[in-house]
């Protein structure tokens, strides 16, 4: 798939092996995995980071294959999932950091263009999440609300 804001071609990536049964070398049970996810969610970690930690430190190749639920759905059941989706939250964090940089360096035109691209991607995501009822219909992005949400 191509890059979003450039004319470059994308790079091909490997696909996850198609597996329907749990590998025999996985030592953790579904209950242990769910408990570990809830424990890490209490510490404030996001679902993508939790998945990476489970893969790298605990040898869990696929949470959904073992538990039957995704990491984010386990976090939602436990009440630790944020009201703003993670991808949108991370983009808002990136935009805030770039705004702080531009306050100190107002002549950095490359970063100004980058901020416009990030904020346009945020607006597209907000439009999608409003359509899928993840965000309320009147939710709007503004740098002030993003700053309040992130901090």
UniProtKB/Swiss-Prot annotation:
Pfam families: Ribosomal_S13_N (PF08069), Ribosomal_S15 (PF00312)
Gene3D superfamilies reported in the protein's UniProt record: 4.10.860.130, S15/NS1, RNA-binding
Keyword Ribosomal protein: yes
PROSITE patterns: RIBOSOMAL_S15
Xref: InterPro entries: Ribosomal_uS15, Ribosomal_uS15_arc_euk, Ribosomal_uS15_N, uS15_NS1_RNA-bd_sf
Disordered: annotated span: 1-20
Gene Ontology CC terms, in alphabetical order: cytosolic small ribosomal subunit
Signal peptide positions on this chain: none
Subunit structure of this chain's protein: Part of the 30S ribosomal subunit.
NCBIfam families: PRK08561.1
Record-stated family: Belongs to the universal ribosomal protein uS15 family.
Protein name stated in the entry: Small ribosomal subunit protein uS15
Source organism of this protein record: Methanococcus maripaludis (strain DSM 14266 / JCM 13030 / NBRC 101832 / S2 / LL)
Organism placement in taxonomy: Archaea, Methanobacteriati, Methanobacteriota, Methanomada group, Methanococci
